Regions:
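Active-site-proximal N-terminal segment of extracellular/periplasmic enzymes that hydrolyze or transfer
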Residues: 1-41
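Residue-level preference for the first positions of well-ordered beta-strands
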Residues: 5-7, 179-183, 229
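Short, solvent-exposed turn/loop segments enriched in Gly/Ser/Thr/Pro and often Arg
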Residues: 32-53, 160-161
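His/Asp/Glu-rich, glycine-adjacent segments
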Residues: 53-197, 206-209, 289-293, 371-385, ...
Length: 403
């Protein structure tokens, strides 16, 4: 028997507002805490958790950026000649995404979404590596680099497998007692919430299913480990989208030409602009100031949010929609969805949640701080599971260093 297994399970989009009044894990993980998220989408939330750093440090923020010099998509421009009614269909985009990802040997999450093929040669994609693997960050290391440097045996989800397949793989590792740390990532709730919203009756059964899975994993771990230190957490919440704004139409009505005067990425909750000619910024800024459903996020606020990039790589101007407002159509999709995240991290539905059977130190306030929990627990698991002759087997004081 081993002494301790730190089990970290990320339930994507299980935000504080969605979960706080539900019975989810109240018996198994009674200590619950509301956590600040980071500004951006899962493309930055997940790397922030895995690295313990903020977007302006690890440089994993939004997926698509203006960078024609390094764009790998030039060969896809011929697709612009196909009917948009065909190329905008999700099933077509998914098939193309799978093919392109394989050809380009991208290891991280990749999706062509609704990027127009007419302009696709202007963009680069920023997650070519997987943050769920060692050496998978754009800058710096992550928890898996840390574990491998210390030769700590661990399990991590394979994003190319289903939740059930990953659960079965982890269960096998637990029964064998081979690992000293586990990180599981379940994304299914996120997809459900996008479809049905944050108050739909389907949420309860999904959380009940997750709780049963977690109970089963803890039971299986009990055959090989004296103690399971359980941490279940999310990266962000989810807001219902009851208002839609055609921001593309607003900007395209200006006397400017896309690709010559400016370039933009219209994400689902924000628009990011690059300016190619003098005076264009002022024209676009003036028009955006009249859009009452959102606002320009200035450099001072971006610095406060730790999402400011001095080189403008992720955009020279960021326009953020109010919570609950969706850009439709956007480069993420042609049609509306019921709910979305990626709003201001202090908006009510943006907060993440942490559930655990351990005491949570006051220093754990935001999702990057989960990294400190992971390194501390993994370090102690190795000390307890593989003691040297000079070590005592008892657990040391369960304190955490301030982040």
């Amino acid at each position: 028997m081993k002494r301790v297994l730190p089990l970290f399970i990320m339930v994507d989009a299980c935000g504080w507002e969605i979960s706080k009044d539900r019975p989810f894990l109240r018996g198994l993980a009674p200590n619950r805490k509301k956590l600040n998220s980071v500004f951006g989408y899962s493309s930055t939330c997940v790397p922030s958790i895995l690295s313990g750093r903020w977007p302006d440090e690890h440089h994993n923020w939004c997926y698509f950026v203006y960078d024609p010099v390094h764009s790998p998509f030039a060969k896809l421009r011929w697709l612009r000649f196909l009917p948009k009614a065909l190329t905008s269909r999700r099933i077509v985009r998914r098939a193309l995404t799978k093919l392109v990802k394989s050809r380009l040997n991208f290891k991280g999450y990749f999706d062509l979404y609704n990027i127009p093929f007419q302009h696709i040669h202007l963009y680069d994609f920023t997650e070519k590596k997987s943050p769920l693997q060692p050496r998978g960050m754009n800058r710096g290391g992550n928890i898996f680099d840390w574990l491998e440097e210390r030769r700590i045996s661990y399990f991590v989800s394979d994003p190319n497998k289903t939740e059930e397949e990953n659960r079965a793989a982890l269960a096998a590792e637990l029964r064998a007692g081979r690992i000293d740390f586990a990180f599981m990532y379940w994304a299914g709730l996120d997809g459900l919430l996008h479809s049905v919203g944050n108050d739909a009756r389907e949420i309860g059964p999904r959380l009940e299913q997750y709780e049963e899975w977690i109970k089963d994993l803890v039971r299986q771990a009990a055959s090989r480990y004296d103690e399971v230190r359980l941490y279940v957490f999310s990266d962000h919440g989810m807001a219902n989208c009851d208002k839609h704004v055609n921001l593309m139409e607003v900007i395209e009505a200006l006397p400017l030409k896309f690709g010559e005067d400016y370039v933009a990425v219209y994400d689902s909750t924000m628009a990011r602009f690059w300016f190619l000619k003098h005076g264009v910024r002022e024209i676009i800024e003036d028009r955006l100031k009249k859009v009452v459903e959102g606002r320009i996020v200035d450099d001072a606020e971006l610095k406060q949010l730790r999402a400011h990039f001095a080189d403008g790589r992720y955009g020279e101007l960021i326009f953020l929609m109010d919570e609950g407002v969706l850009i439709v159509p956007s480069h993420m999709g042609e049609r509306p969805i019921r709910a979305m995240h990626g709003y201001h991290p202090r908006d009510p539905q943006s907060y993440a949640a942490l559930f655990t059977n351990q005491v949570v130190p006051e220093s754990i306030q935001a999702i990057p701080h989960i990294y400190n929990l992971m390194t501390r627990e993994a370090d102690e698991a190795v000390r307890l599971n593989h003691p040297t002759p000079s070590q005592k087997p008892e657990s040391k004081n369960h304190e955490l260093l301030t982040v």
